[in-house]
Structure formats: C-alpha cells, structure tokens
C-alpha cells in the first residue's frame, strides 16, 4: 500500500522530495509542535530556500534553510536517490548548522 503524500516538490538541486501525511503528523505532534499550520512554509523552504547545506555527520542529508519573519526554518531531507528523497524533520531555529554549502540564493 502506497503511503499517502502530504506533498512532493522539486528542489533547486533538482531533487524530488516527499512528505507523507504520517511523517508530518509525527513532526507536529511529537517533535516540533510549533510547526503546526506551517506545512506551506516547509514546501516553500524546499522549493525556494535561501541556502542548502550538507550535514557534517552525513553528507547525504541536506539541510534546507529559509528565513521567515520571526526565525529561520530548517527542513532536513534524507535519502540517497535524488528522485526519492524525503523530509526527515523540520524545525525553527535562530542560526544555521555548520556544513558544506550546496546551494545559495
């Protein structure tokens, strides 16, 4: 049975990234409740980020950043296949993690 998608977007790196409904529910219920109602911002961050960095711990994990009015949104994306990447988590932050820049606006 296919997982139900909340959305799928193509990033500036030409990667297809998906977010399932179950994963989004887990993020906003248990990990980062402040993101409730911000799924549109998560999509925008993936489509039109300010910066994309590779994780220091795992270079195949990418961190997408977009500045909002009150903070910075970070969307963490995993997966090896550029056409089958997925949202691991997302959160609000005040700064960027260290890592190699892959793309900048």
Predicted regions and their residues:
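Ribonuclease/tRNase effector modules and their secretory precursors
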Residues: 1-105
């Amino acid at each position: 049975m296919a997982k139900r998608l909340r959305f799928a977007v193509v990033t500036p790196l030409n990667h297809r990234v998906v977010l399932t409904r179950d994963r989004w529910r887990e993020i906003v219920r248990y990990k980062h409740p402040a993101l409730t109602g911000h799924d549109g911002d998560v999509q925008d961050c993936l489509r039109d980020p300010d910066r994309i960095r590779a994780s220091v711990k795992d270079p195949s994990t990418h961190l997408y950043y977009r500045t909002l009015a009150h903070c910075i949104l970070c969307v963490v994306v995993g997966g090896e296949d550029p056409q089958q990447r997925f949202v691991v988590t997302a959160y609000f932050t005040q700064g960027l993690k260290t890592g190699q820049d892959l793309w900048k606006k």
